[in-house]
Amino acid sequence: MAYPLQLGLQDATSPIMEELTSFHDHTLMIVFLISSLVLYIISSMLTTKMTHTNTMDAQGVETIWTILPAAILVLIALPSLRILYMMDEINNPALTVKTMGHQWYWSYEYTDYEDLYFDSYMTPTSDLKPGELRLLEVDNRVVLPMELPIRMLISSEDVLHSWAVPSLGLKTDAIPGRLNQATISSNRPGLFYGQCSEICGSNHSFMPIVLEMVPLKHFENWSASMI
């Protein structure tokens, strides 16, 4: 989860988020090197009296500044495409959960069970218990088994929403009349918080998401108690 005054990304909880974090560091290093080179060239031009105003043709330099940016773009594009395809890939999910966005709450349906569905509303500030987080707690958490591939089917009942959990590397639009898919796989148990990430009306900021990742045995006990 996020912390006050935190700089950088949240701790990765899923393999996809670990890949995204590595890609972020990879791209940031390229940006840093390019920025350093540009600043060095600018400072050299401003601090030296050595100038050459008679150059009419420099094919070697033009070749370098054409090939080098192309190579840099390839170094960015290849890992980006790899992660993009990984995010869409899912084989034999252990569980499927249908998520519907509403103004202004989420509803969840465990499609592998006959009567396991519920609505999830934000807990009012006046009802919070000690240690709970303002604007992030809900009355019904989404309980899921850890270390298993889970398919989330995401849509909306009214307007555009977006179902996002940063520590899992998830952000999928909820579009009326369209079913989008996302994959969840958590490396560890815990509570993971998210929010609606698409402006959807006056109470947009009051649509938190709470995932509770637990061992498979605990999930089976919870699902049996809910049916």
Curated annotation (Swiss-Prot):
Transmembrane residues, as ranges?
15-45, 60-87
**Topology in the lipid bilayer:** Multi-pass membrane protein
- Residues that bind Cu cation A1, according to the entry? 161, 196, 200, 207
Residues bound to Cu cation A2 are 196, 198, 200, 204
Residues exposed to the Mitochondrial intermembrane side: 1-14, 88-227
What Enzyme Commission number(s) appear in the record?
Answer: 7.1.1.9
- PROSITE patterns, per database record: COX2, COX2_CUA, COX2_TM
Membrane side Mitochondrial matrix: residue ranges: 46-59
Q: Subunit info?
A: Component of the cytochrome c oxidase (complex IV, CIV), a multisubunit enzyme composed of 14 subunits. The complex is composed of a catalytic core of 3 subunits MT-CO1, MT-CO2 and MT-CO3, encoded in the mitochondrial DNA, and 11 supernumerary subunits COX4I, COX5A, COX5B, COX6A, COX6B, COX6C, COX7A, COX7B, COX7C, COX8 and NDUFA4, which are encoded in the nuclear genome.
Described function: Component of the cytochrome c oxidase, the last enzyme in the mitochondrial electron transport chain which drives oxidative phosphorylation. The respiratory chain contains 3 multisubunit complexes succinate dehydrogenase (complex II, CII), ubiquinol-cytochrome c oxidoreductase (cytochrome b-c1 complex, complex III, CIII) and cytochrome c oxidase (complex IV, CIV), that cooperate to transfer electrons derived from NADH and succinate to molecular oxygen, creating an electrochemical gradient over the inner membrane that drives transmembrane transport and the ATP synthase.
Name by which UniProt lists this protein: Cytochrome c oxidase subunit 2
Protein source organism: Acomys ignitus
Taxonomic lineage from the root: Eukaryota, Metazoa, Chordata, Craniata, Vertebrata
**Gene of this entry:** MT-CO2
